[in-house]
Amino acid sequence: MKKLLLLTAILSSGLYAASIDHIQTYSPDYLANQAQTGMINGVSAYYNPAGLGRLEKGKYFHVGFQFAHGHEKMSYKEKEHKAKLNQAIPNIALTFVDNKGATFFNFGGLAGGGKLQYDGVSGVDVLTDLAQFKLLGIYDKGSSLTGSNKYEQITLGRAFNIDDKLSFSIAGRVVHGTRKLNGSLNIGVNPTAQYRQEKAQQVAQEVSRAVDAATQGKGLSAAQIAAIKTQKTNEALAKLQKRVTDLTQNGLSGDIDSKREAWGYGFQLGINYRVNDKLNLAARYDSRVKMNFKAKGHEYQLQTTDILGQTIGLSTFYPQYTINSKIRRDLPAILSVGASYKITDNYLVSGIGNFYFNHQAKMDRVTTFGEHQHGRDYKNGWEIAIGNEYKLNDKFTLIGSVNYARTGAKNSSFNDTEYALNSVTLGGGIRYQYDESLAITASVAHFIYKGAEGNFKEKYGVTENQKYKKEITAVGLSITKKF
């Protein structure tokens, strides 16, 4: 396991997720054809394990490599923040086919998101419009946020042939996940005259009450008490003026470096029914994986107790990253069904439908800044895909597909660290059959995401929502070798 986890230095999955966290790009072959569940081929260890026993007897080794390039953007009013994405993703699978079925093993990315670095975020931009911050005249002096979510999975299982048509599979899954948040808050402050006046009045009232309480029953005259109040008030106002001057000159700063980590375990069930030489039907169920993430690291919050009544940091807005917290974020169960049909000896079509049980999973159910609830408003997600494979000759096969996905994420779940957008994916590729035992597949996919708005208007009472967009293109290369 430790050796496999060394691969995570270059493995970051979920770059083009079809659901909240989950991906389906377990292999580069998926980029070319996103309708894999009903097919039987060299990548069935990922998509249709129950069908592996229908392959020719032998040992199969599959290795793949994907590279994704693109960008993600968030904006609020006239301020836009953009993060570039460049990420590599490897995968590996081993399959041993015998007369009774097949034993399979695979390792690769399962869920999460690529590493993104923003030079500011909309969650900071909106603070200038909030009533509790407006009089302070706060503004961003150069805050930054970097986040990454990575999940790796090992699957080990067995496929059993019942007869020449029906087969099923069962497997165990081990999942490791890390979710990181690293950022700095650099906030400028330019208090308004109204703030200074109201704060001075507040200080004077607090001093007066404190002196009254301290001198009660001491036998002091009214003049003596008044003199004490004047002295204490002047001292407090001088201290306030010094604090305001410091805020104006230096602003406020804070940072966080939080790493959440968890292990989870699950199972996988599959069934395959070969109707005839042309039509194949299959289904796969991946169980929910319970993951209890514990956060480690450090955080320094903005020292704002004297001006706001509390300290504020990035964990105020993203409490799931609070140091030493332990919060559930499960991977939802998946049900995938698919079919493939060989129209001619050279032309095969396939289709799939995936259903994500998001509503049954606990995903970062926390209370954020302003007593707003997060993680309780996910709907179930789904996607459909159609694929085509046309054999040009004995050596080359053209591949193409289209996918439509709805993640199930409501706009109330969107924030700077997480926004799962609905998408359309166009994929294509070519497979080169070097000989009967070696196939090489080159693939490409372009992910077209539907831009969406968040819920700042509802959440904070401002006049405009934040907006999210992203665009990603991925290329891949895989090799499948039969021994």
Regions found by a protein language model. Give the residues of each.
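Repeated loop/turn-to-beta-strand initiation elements of outer-membrane beta-barrel proteins
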Residues: 100-103, 165-168, 278-281, 346-349, ...
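N-terminal, post-signal peptide beta-strand-biased segments of exported outer-membrane/organellar beta-barrel
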Residues: 15-118, 122, 131, 142, ...
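Residue-level signature of outer-membrane beta-barrel architecture
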Residues: 53, 94-98, 160, 269, ...
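Detector for outer-membrane/organellar transmembrane beta-barrel domains
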Residues: 270-274, 278-294, 324-408
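Outer-membrane beta-barrel "beta-signal"
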Residues: 430-432, 438, 469-483
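Residues that define the transmembrane beta-barrel architecture of outer-membrane proteins
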Residues: 43, 84-90, 150-154, 263-267, ...
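Solvent-exposed loop segments that connect transmembrane elements
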Residues: 119-141, 180-257, 293-324, 361-374, ...
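Transmembrane beta-barrel strands of outer-membrane/channel proteins
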Residues: 61-69, 105-109, 170-174, 283-287, ...
